[in-house]
Structure formats: C-alpha cells, structure tokens
C-alpha cells in the first residue's frame, strides 16, 4: 500500500457564518497549494464544515514523500579557482559556495552549464520520507493561511484565529497523533471529536476516518453542508405540500442557515394576521435579518401572484422531539419584532415627507447635506427631463413638475424609523409613505426605484420617468465624489462607484437614451455649477472602462470603438455589437484579415498626424489608377445612405481590396512634395472616416 485516507478535523468555537462562507470557497485551492509545495500527489480533496469544525478529507494521501533532487548553481569556474588549470584548488569564492551548502569535501567538485557558462554545481538528493511528519506542519500552515477578515487571540496563545481552536484530530494509516503539543494555539492533540451538544459535551475517541464518520452520524452531526442543505430543502418541500404554501428560498439565507447548523430541521411557525397590514418588505426583511426565517406565501393559481402568508420557516439546530415548543419560542420572538415594526411604521406615517429635515444629515463629509444633494439632483433631473421629454408620454410642464416632486421627496425615508432599523429598505419605504400621502403613483414608484439596479443582473427602473430620477442620483454622486477626490483605486471602492456607473450605463442602454459622455457630462457639470473643479476626462475614462463589464464581447472590439471620438453610450454599444456580428461571421474571415493588414498600414502612415492640420486633397494630383480606384470606392461609401450599421461596416470592410492595391502600387512618400502631401491628406480622410465605426488596428482576433 502506497497511500491511505487522511482525515483532519479542526475543532473550534462557533464560526461566524458569513466569514466562513466567504473563505470556504478558497480553502481547497489553498490546501492544494500546500501539497504541491511539498510535491505530494494526493487523490481527491474534500473540505466539510459545521459551525464547530472544519474537516479536511484527502483520498490516497501518500505514505512516503517522493525522492527529489535539489540543484545548486555556484559561480563560474573561471573565477572560482586560484588558477586557470584548477591545480591550486578553489579560491574563497568557490569555497564559499560549498560552505554555504554545509559541504566539506571540495575535491570532487562538479560543474554544469547555466546561461552558456560553466559553473560550480551540486545536486542534493532527498530520499523518500514518511509523510506523517509533514501532516501537522501542513495543517498549521493551512490554518495560518486562512483569511476570515478578522481574527482573535485567547489565553496566552502565540497565533490568532477567527475563533479559539480546541483540538486538531488527525487520522491517518493507524498512526498515533495523540498528545502533540500545539503551542501556537495552546492545546495538545487528541484523536477524538465532539458531537452535537445535545448528545454530550465530552470528547469521543476515534481511530479511523470510518469511525469518525460513524460517530458523527450516530450523534446528529451532518458533516457535509450539501447534505444539510438537501435536508432543509426536502423538509421545506414537505411543508409546502402539506400546508398548501410556497416558501421563498433566499439563496443567501439558505447558505447561512446551513452554516450555523449541524443537524437542521425546517419547522413552520405562524404570526398574527394583523401584522399583514405592514408592507411585505418590512415583514420579510425583519424575519430574514433578525431571525433568519424564510418567508411564506399563499399557494395561488398560475394566473395570480402569491400573497404573503402569516407563516414563516425557522431552521432549528435542536434535536428536541418537542417541535411545538421550538415553534412557540420563535413565534414569541417574531411577535415582539413585528410589534416594534408596527410602532416604527405608524410613527413614520405621521410625518409628512415635505417636512423631513434633510439639512440635518451629512451626505459625505465635505459634500454638503442630503438637502444639498437633493437640490443638485433636482437640477440634473430638470436637464434630463427636457432632454428625454419625447419618451415620457406627457406634456413637458407636467413631467418637470412630477419629476421635480419625486426628487424632492426621494431621500425623505432615510430619516424614517423603519429605514433606520432596516437600511436595505431605503427607497422601498419611501414608496409606501408616498402612496399613503397620496403622491402620484409615478412619483412614488420612482422613489422606490431610484437605487436600481442594485447589482449586475438586478432589475432596472420600470420607466423612463423612474430612470431619470435614478440617473440624477447616480450622476450627482459621481460628480460629487470625483470632485472630492474619492475615486476608486485598485480593489477599494467604498462608495460603490463602479456599480453605480455600471447601473448608469445599463439604464441609458436599456431605454435607448441619448447621453454623450463628453458633452452631457460637461453640460451637467456647468449647469449644476457647485461642484469643485476637476478634470472631467477622469470621470469620462472611468465610465468608458465600465463598457467592458456591460458588453459580453472580445475586449479589443470594445477598445476599438472607445478609441474613436464616439461618446454616445447607445451608439458605442451599437457599434461594438455590429462589429462583433460582422467579425463573428465565418464568411467574413478572409475579408477581415486583409483589412486588418491594410488598416494597420493606413494607421501607421497617419500616426504622427496633427488632427488640426488641413486635410484637403485634389483628385487632379492623382497619378495612379489605384488612387482613383480607392477614391471611387471610398466616395461611394461617403455618399451612400446606409440602412444601418451592419451594411455600413460591410461597405467599409469592402475597402480591403482597393486599399491593398493602393499600397502595392502607390508610393505615398513621393519625391514631389505636393503629390506626397496630397496622398497623405487623402489617406488621412480615409482613416478618419474608418474611425466612424472603430479603430480597426486595435482589434485582435
């Protein structure tokens, strides 16, 4: 037998769920790296967890290390000896090489060639050794390499960890791993484990991976998180069928309850129907954030959308057979939570949205109050409303009035008691308060949707009306924070400006709105007129970089369009997609290769050209047939009315043939300066015209 199963359990105090889930994804990679570092070829690696333990299971862990050769290269032999024929032995430099390696026999030296030079050389053979002596060092290095964000020290231990470690149990090939002192964490190892707390608090000895799994299974510990998840989902499904309900499975919440349980059980509780007068979001958020409960909905026909049910799913870690006692305890806690929510909500309804003291809340230090921000957004919203009036399906005067009202009350809920308790309900509560105070429904909905999209694939504002309110918020935040120098760098983006910028582009693209990242940014900056001065090109560039996240496409195609003067968001996207369609079409393969080659020559000729230089040319100075042929083909494109971008790109790529012939037969740098200048001016016009679709030299396919 050359290998055996290795199991390592790290027994800890309860691990915080979110920190555990974040780092769990990285654990297999980190363990693989430690094995590779020691040239250990192991079989399949599995890592399991419960809130109280991490378990590393490695199939076919080798009993012996591999025999390895370690090579050392010294100084060139020309400078390592006292004389050239080496008869007088090694000099200080040569001796130093061997002494550094702890070798005393210098008489039988070896040489090797490195970088075409003969140098002193020594090879050290590492014989096979038992791997059992490597296991604890690997485990300790693994623990030290885990990053949970925060760590703590306990007692007089040398190392820190996210929670105190109580034991490391190693089971491998019948070897004895008992009593190994782990000074770093302040304990001696035991080949033992602990089970579910309701089954006992003492260590239970185990002598093999098989025995370990049997002990846990017998004592209500489901080690595999996938099996715990499956148990929860199966029990929820049974409750849905039995009670004719639908349970909303929140993925993040499911992951969390899996991480905080060792033997989960899904139980159905209920709350007083009187609480259903609260907005659904208050109830579901309170259940999720405070109690880790899943929301329950009434089962309806396919034509009807489900309504919130006065029930909830709690996932218990108890193995108590008296389930009703557990349910009753959770119902009591939820009743108190929802009673608080009713109190907060009813208090908020008493406060008119107009009277919210926004001036008392600082937006960002140095950037004024929420009232200042609201006033800046109002100016931006007015500009956008006038610009997009044809898409609003209402008279301009009415649109200005309603959107102005929406912006004025949009931040009022930030000072509400409910949002103070549940910050994720900002905007949502503003919507409910606006409806209760008889605001226009479009106004109320735009307050709710002002923060959309919340993530890359999240919903967008449902109308151009709401889009204007959302864009106003995003544009003001970008102007304000960039003007204050709070620009994202590296992985740091404390104000989520990358997400905010992505949302801006996505909204504009979705509704096909005209927005120029040079002209409109400049106009808005000047119109608001209160931002600290900064280089708008920095913001423009920042927004342009987000196109790489917005469009699923070869980055070089996106780059080719961004390298032109086009700054209209929708047109950039249209050009990128049209180029992609053309380049992805197999029938265009030869055409695109020929054009790439010709365009690069065209770009090289014009690379040092001053854009402000006159580009006038005269056909009368054309001497070669190929000049006339290229001009006629180019002029035909210039005078054509294309149905769309696809046909325009097709036409431009059709210039590959006359361009190739031109460069084969025409000497651009003619001795006659007038002819030379005429040819360069003509080619500059062709080059500039190409830039209407993209900077083709940037494309790499």
Curated annotation (Swiss-Prot):
Gene Ontology cellular component annotations, sorted alphabetically: cytosol
Similarity remark: Belongs to the class-II aminoacyl-tRNA synthetase family.
GO biological process: glycyl-tRNA aminoacylation
Class of this enzyme: ligase
Statement: the UniProt record of this protein carries the keyword Nucleotidyltransferase: no
Organism the protein comes from: Helicobacter pylori (strain HPAG1)
Keywords: Aminoacyl-tRNA synthetase, ATP-binding, Cytoplasm, Ligase, Nucleotide-binding, Protein biosynthesis
Catalysed reactions listed for this entry: tRNA(Gly) + glycine + ATP = glycyl-tRNA(Gly) + AMP + diphosphate
Pfam families, per database record: tRNA_synt_2f
Localization, UniProt: Cytoplasm
Subunit structure, as described in the record: Tetramer of two alpha and two beta subunits.
EC number(s) given by UniProt: 6.1.1.14
MF terms in GO: ATP binding; glycine-tRNA ligase activity
InterPro entries: Gly-tRNA-synth_bsu, Gly-tRNA-synth_heterodimer
Protein name: Glycine--tRNA ligase beta subunit
